[in-house]
Curated annotation (Swiss-Prot):
Protein known as: Thiamine thiazole synthase
Organism: Fusarium vanettenii (strain ATCC MYA-4622 / CBS 123669 / FGSC 9596 / NRRL 45880 / 77-13-4) (Fusarium solani subsp. pisi)
Residues modified as 2,3-didehydroalanine (Cys): 211
One Pfam family cited in the UniProt record for this chain: Thi4
Lineage start: Eukaryota, Fungi, Dikarya, Ascomycota, Pezizomycotina
Catalytic reaction annotation: [ADP-thiazole synthase]-L-cysteine + glycine + NAD(+) = [ADP-thiazole synthase]-dehydroalanine + ADP-5-ethyl-4-methylthiazole-2-carboxylate + nicotinamide + 3 H2O + 2 H(+)
Length: 322
């Protein structure tokens, strides 16, 4: 005899009155943030929305590793997030939203030397016509005739950085350094086809730790704007010498603002196939003068680097298929 079939009891929905809950100041009923005006004067009752520590960990980790995956194959890699690199990124990201652009910056704080003017002073001086770029990104300045003055260099750097980071096709990997260049054989000898990366803190300890291999990013085009010679500066061009792609560096000459800025902007170019060099790193290749605390050439060298990149990108992309 078969067991009796189970019969579900008749159910009817019952609406239960939700107990009244006193919402903390700062949250509305649908968990949206209150306005500042609603919070003012009510700090004794203030409370943040609840969170579990693992939620924070997963929110950061998931997004960062997704970025690593997305940008493992980039269209353009920019080494160095100083004024030149950020200016190049801004133009590229704006003109070509279809390109995937990775910026690699060794420091925790991007911006290079553009947070202050000369001798740790605040004001930033740019010679005309670099004021055109300030107007483009919305940085106010005082007009002094042949040059303009931004009241604090950090105003320029924070503004251009905010513009760049809001572009959906650009990812900044800071606290990350480039340890080497990826190369491919080509008719011209060697073509640059990406970068070798590592955490900066790891790179600083290769002498006292072992087995700390790097990561890689493939890209048909690299723009190097790492600054003049230093611990991380002029990295790419120094590596070209050790790879025997260029014979030697010209070495940066003494300070001459009038000569230096024109030379840097005019000289910004593809040094070897797949590698464009701009900013003060270029002075180490060409033996150009240093310019000191005037920043117009850094911004406009970035603009020219972006322009040069767009001229040759399609060619380098075809070459980089394998």
């Amino acid at each position: 005899m078969s067991p009796p079939a189970a019969v579900s009891p008749t159910t009817r929905s019952v609406e239960l009155a939700a107990p009244a809950v006193k919402l903390p100041v700062g949250l509305s009923k649908n968990n949206t943030t209150a306005t500042i005006e609603e919070m003012e004067g009510k700090w004794d009752d203030f409370k943040f929305a609840p969170i579990r520590e693992s939620q924070v960990s997963r929110a950061m980790t998931r997004r960062y590793f997704q970025d690593l995956d997305n940008y493992a194959e980039s269209d353009i890699v920019i080494i160095g997030a100083g004024s030149c690199g950020l200016s190049a990124a801004y133009i590229l990201g704006k003109k070509r939203p279809d390109l995937r652009i990775a910026i690699i910056e060794a420091s925790v704080s991007p911006g290079g030397g553009a947070w202050l003017g000369g001798q740790l002073f605040s004001a930033m001086v740019m010679r005309k016509p670099a004021d055109a770029f300030l107007r483009e990104v919305g940085v106010p300045y005082e007009d002094e005739g042949n040059y303009v003055v931004v009241k604090h260099a950090a105003l320029f750097t924070s503004t251009i950085m905010s513009k760049v980071l809001q572009l959906p096709n650009i990812k900044l990997f800071n606290a990350t350094c480039v340890e080497d260049l990826i190369t491919r054989p080509s008719e011209e000898g060697v073509r640059i086809s990406g970068v070798v990366t590592n955490w900066t803190l790891v790179s600083m300890h290769h002498d006292d730790q072992s087995c700390m291999d790097p990561n890689t990013i493939n890209a048909p085009l690299v723009i190097s704007t790492t600054g003049h010679d230093g611990p991380m500066g002029a990295f790419s061009v120094k590596r070209l010498v050790s790879m025997q792609r260029i014979e030697k560096l010209g070495g940066m000459r003494g300070l001459d603002m009038n000569v230096a800025e024109d030379a840097i902007v005019k000289g910004t170019r593809e040094i070897v196939p797949g590698l464009i060099v701009g900013g003060m790193e270029l002075s180490e290749v060409d033996g150009a003068n240093r310019m000191g605390p005037t920043f117009g050439a850094m911004a406009l060298s970035g603009l020219k680097a972006a322009e040069e990149a767009l001229k040759i990108f399609d060619i380098r992309k075809k070459q980089n298929a394998f």
